[in-house]
Amino acid sequence: INMTGIKQRDELQSTIWKIANEVRGAVDGWDFKQFVLGTLFYRFISENFTSYIEGGDDSIHYADMSDDVITTEIKDDAIKTKGYFIYPSQLFVNIAKSAYTNPNLNTDLAAIFDAIEGSANRYPSEHDIKGLFADFDTTSNRLGNTVEEKNKRLAAVIKGVESLDFGNFEDNEIDLFGDAYEFLISNYAANAGKSGGEFFTPQNVSKLIAQLALSGQTSVNKIYDPACGSGSLLLQAKKQFDAHLIEEGFFGQEINHTTYNLARMNMFLHNINYDKFDIALGDTLIKPHYGDEKPFDAIVSNPPYSVNWVGSDDPTLINDDRFAPAGVLAPKSKADFAFVLHALSYLSARGRAAIVCFPGIFYRGGAEQKIRKYLVDNNFIETVISVSYTHLRAHETRRHL
């Protein structure tokens, strides 16, 4: 990346945070984040889709076309390629034009988001698109009490995002949209304190984890994060290594619905096509989604620290392929080792997992001691790295990799 690119990115990020703070008014940033992030995503997919339709032909201006010229064939082909469809009238640029004067802005936006999601119905991309805008509630009181107030706030967000200079879409050598999105997420997380850390791993730590998991590999079949949050760890693998290194794409599971949507948006924003990623919603420990996709050559994860799980209250779990080999389940009040054993069972013979863990699992007795012994006796542990809390801003304790 040249210095101009870095300067452009830094300027963009300071502008975007300023706008994010201006448009939220008195609403807490954490509660308002889905509107800013969702609008940024809406602009991105609009420009990405326009770029695809125009195909580099300067004589085509998709935003100026009439919706009537779109044939069934064009639409079908576009959805198979991009995963979704956006009519010219639905593009971000066209909604932004009349944002402040449109009395139906909130209902128009809701209808457009429904239409974009609905365009993927019965197509292979349906799972990746469905519900993407679910958290963008245009009727929310966080936007204001009356329709007029809501529309004014929505228009301010749209115009703010419109004012950001991402340069020419085709010429973007760095993931400016993706970087802006991740920058916003990290700032929201830092300002929210502990709650933010549950869905975002700081960039310096995620870089290290990606490097540990992929170092020395000439290719990996696919990469997986069993507690993927907003997808930042998976995406570091793409940033640190040539995307071609990861042959079959990116897989992740996330338990929180809002965060699951952020992760899917994050994949698109980093130019990962719908057929190259699969993010699932659900509890990895109880209902793992990717049993049929294993083994994985690379696993990266920063699972929640010492959370409760059903453990021994579910008698079937001790016979689960993931936990049976250790002969004991992780304690009900500390699921840390359950995530580690889950990752281990999903690794290929040549695979490597890099996982951020709470230090307690290295010295507590009982079941955790037995699991430690199992891991060490079978030579599954390559190394343990201590990371100071300053590298994990949202958590004021030490961590180990």
Residues of each region from the PLM?
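Soluble or luminal CAZymes and related metallo-dependent hydrolases
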Residues: 11, 15, 255, 335
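Glycine-rich, charged/polar anion/phosphate-binding loops
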Residues: 339-342, 385-389
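Glycine-rich S-adenosyl-L-methionine
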Residues: 322-346
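Short glycine-dipeptide loop
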Residues: 347-352
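Non-catalytic, mostly N-terminal accessory regions of nucleic-acid modification and defense proteins
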Residues: 1-208, 212-213, 217, 275-286, ...
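Conserved S-adenosyl-L-methionine
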Residues: 195-301, 306-308, 313-317, 323, ...
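Conserved small/polar residues in nucleotide/adenosyl-binding loops
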Residues: 390-397
